[in-house]
Each structure stands twice: as structure tokens, then as C-alpha cells.
């Protein structure tokens, strides 16, 4: 440290003491960021020199390297951060360090905007609020700044203990180098910050991709570089090799395999930002963990800000890995807390539209490859359908969703595919939710639809029970569950070949009067167990099924809410009976000939139990079900 003369003690601006306490004790929740802030300020200083040297070449020696050097003195518990950037004179030190939120960087940007905006592209500035420097007082009992401004020969020292005052002095030496050197007299308990590996970790985490090299001066006087040569996302797309992508993907994704899709874009519209995002080819094991956070890192001019509070990527795109870098992102006084404002929302909308657009292109061009993505992340993507959004945006999201159906066997279809195949007399998009494809394909609910060639979507992800209660239509075509009891399938064309006999079987043996009387009897027997008993218009092979009235809650959704203690009752369902099924036909004959009987009563209860089991509903009384089953079986001749 050099000697000084002409010292002058000055006070910080009004209320600075209170603000300084806020910065030290409240604003920053992570002490590591003090070094990030000081490195960012040093990078700003190098940016300023590089810019001003364009019009005044004497400010910078030809071929000299702009750099940042970190060194330590473990015996004195001191940390040093040096740069050979623009430097500061006495006036700069007082204005920029004596007044919080009086940012030299901000003033510099204003000067560019007012006079030399055509060259603004060469300047990338980080700090906008002028308080990052004061985060040094979180770890230091005293901060000393020695600086000499480019083009000047006199250097100055700024010194403060963060107690409301600072001392400004002139450096004695007439051989002062251009740039700034910051000395932190660390508090005893902050000795970890003189450890080389600790410093390297902080630089790697926060400042790995800034414009200028960051060196650590080791015990031998050798400079070891701590950061990367360049941020990969600043390169043109065609300049990044597959190997570079793979290496960077492994760094940010922490999953195996190769990226399934790479999204590298630079937006230069009203809001400028760059995104380098990857979609993995392997599903992370913790994709559905409730504490899982977004894995997209936020940078401001290549300085890492956070990945914990990024609101730019919605939860339903949490499988994205990579970075977003912008100079337009607003920050609250600290770089740690992002403002939730219109700029962030605009970036979010732009990013989401771009991601959905690329997914749609892939789905339309290569459904086999897209199926791999959908198997990994389709259920996550559908979570977005449950969120509040305008119709246009929701339909964009639905357009990239793919579904199984009764028409497609085991291949995926889009809702556009479904609508194109709808029958002329069909007004709804029909769907059925279930646990898995194998079981849902055997559901009695599908029989009438399949026999008439009406396509039904087969939805087997847990999230399907939720979004189908939010999304009511697509392209103005209503979505409708096949479990609705009032669905009339008679308007559709005759059953397909091979099924005619099923629909016509016994049609002359059962009169409507006999059926109606039996239905009335069944409703009387089952009384409080069902809300109604009716003849089914959709069953062809099964004797019975459960149904719900239009407007009632879906069976699976109601069960989920009960399990989550969000619903404290169980609604009664409608029992639909296939009057042409052999079992039901015999029961009708027996009732017509002999009237009520214990056997018929038991069989009706067993059929209701069967319908409940097929829908995943709990039996109201398992012991009663077993007793009735044994009673019926005991009468077999």
C-alpha cells in the first residue's frame, strides 16, 4: 500500500449510514456476492476504458491486456482486487463511492445515450445501481480503494470503515499505474475469503463468463486464470461445435445423455436477451419433486445472478436447462432479487412462444423423435394447461401436446388430428382418464364409442384429471368426458361390421315396459347407494358402468380431492345398465316372472360393486360385498 498526503475526512451523503446498514445487513443474503460485485465493477471499468480508447488511443497501450487480478495476504487477513481499467480520480471517488445509488456506470450509460449511441454495442456494463461496492462491508472492517484515472498521472486513495465517513487522500508516488486496486481488511470471522479455492469457487460460480480474464496471483507470483475464455452463448450458432454444446450442457444440466434439442437465440427487439437452452434426452429423477427448482441460470452481461428465483421460465417448462443473458433485466438494488415487472413478463412470453414453436416444428416433422420427448416431459408440459392464461396462449400449448386415442393404437396424435377425423354429426372431443393404457382400453365406458367408430382420447397421466377440468374446448370444439351419463350415441352411424349382432341381440325379447319396471326395481334396491339407475346408451359388452351427470365432478377428480382431504363427502353416482347384456336380460326375465327376490337383490349389489371396482372406487362395505358374492355362488347348481 502506498503512502498518502493531503488527506481529507468527508461524510457520506445524507442518510447513507442507514442505507449502508441496509446493504450490509439486509440487502444481501449471500456473502459470496461481494466478490461478484467487485469483479463486476472491475469489468465495468475495463469496458469504459475500451470504449473511451476508441476515440482516444493514448488512454490504452497497444496490445495491453485488460484484466482483473485477485490476490491475498493470509497473514494480514486481506483480500485484494485489482483491474487496469479506466480508473478514478479524486472527483470520481467522491461522487461514485461517497454517494450510494450515484452510479458512475449509470452516468456513463447516460453519456453514451446522449452522444455516442452508435458505438454502444462495444460496451457491456453490469452495475446499474451503484451499491454493489458497499457489499464489501459485509466481510471487511475496512475498505481501501487506490485508483489512478487513465490519462492522468496522480492517484488517489479512498478509505472507509463503513461508519458514515470516508477519507480521501492523494497517493505520494508519481509512478502510479492506471486502474484500481481494492484492499479489504477482512473481519476475523471472514478468513475463508483469503483461501484460494474459496475464491476460485466464487469466481467460477458468478463471474466465469465475463468479458475479461480473472487471475489469481499465487504464492509464486504467478497469475492463474480462474474464468473461461468466452461465454459460449455469445458465439454465433454455426461457430459452436457439437463438443462445445455437449460440454456446456453437462455443466448446466447435471444429467446424462445428450441434449435432445438446442435452443440458441439472440433477441434484438425492444428487449435484448440471449438464450441458450437445452432439452435433455433423459428425464431427471427429481422432475416431480415438490422442491425442484428451475435449472435455468440468469446472467446479466455474462455475470451470473441467480437460478433460484428466476420467474422467466414457467414451472411447466422446468425440464429446460441452460442460461438466459440480458442487459435489460431490471434488478432491485441488490442483484439477488429480481423485480417482477413487465420486462420480465415480456421475456417470459417471448421465450415460451419460441420454445413452443420449436416443439411444434419437431412434432410435425418427426413424430417418432418427438414421442421420446413426450414420454419424458409430456406430463410436465400439460401442467401448463392448468395455469391461468389467455385462450390464444393456451391453444398454442395444447397444439404441442400429444395424446393416445382409440384410433391410434400406441401412437400419439394431436387434437388437430382428432378434429380432422371427427364424424359429421360429432360436436365434442371425447376423452377418458385412467391409470394406464392397458386398463383404460378395456374400460366399459368406451364400448359404445368404439363400436360406432367415434374416437376417444385416452389420458393416463395424473395431470390429465386436472387440466380437463380447466380446458373446456379447443378451437371452439368442446371437450367432453365419456363418463357423462347423458351422452346419446344413437345419433352416430350404425355400429361397425361385426358388432351389429351385439346391438341387435335380444332386441325383440325385451319390451320397453319390462325394462322400465326392472330399472325402477333396481333403483329401489340400490336406493341411497346411487343417485339414479338408467338404461345405458353406450354399453355393448359390459352389463353395467358408473356415470356422472353433466356438470358433476369427474369421478377421478373427486376421489383425488377426498384423498387430499380437500373434500369431505362422497357423491352418489349414476348406475347405467346394459339391458341387452345376457346377465341383465336374464335378471329382467326373472323379475318379470317372479318379482322381487333375494337373488336379484344380491346380484344388483354385486353389479354395482363391479362398476365401482372398474372405476377405481372403494366399495362401501367390503364384507357385505363378500357375503352377497358367497350367497350367489352357493346357489350354483
Swiss-Prot record:
Cell compartment(s), UniProt: Cytoplasm
Annotated GO MF terms: ATP binding; ATP hydrolysis activity; ATP-dependent protein folding chaperone; unfolded protein binding
Region (C): 560-637
Region (A): 1-335
Keywords for this protein: ATP-binding, Chaperone, Cytoplasm, Nucleotide-binding, Stress response
Pfam families: HATPase_c_3 (PF13589), HSP90 (PF00183)
Coiled coil: none
InterPro entries per UniProt: HATPase_C_sf, Heat_shock_protein_90_CS, HSP90_C, Hsp90_fam, Hsp90_N, Ribosomal_Su5_D2-typ_SF
Positions of region (B): 336-559
Subunit structure: Homodimer.
Described purpose of this protein according to its UniProt entry: Molecular chaperone. Has ATPase activity.
Family classification: Belongs to the heat shock protein 90 family.
UniProt name for this protein: Chaperone protein HtpG
Organism: Ehrlichia ruminantium (strain Gardel)
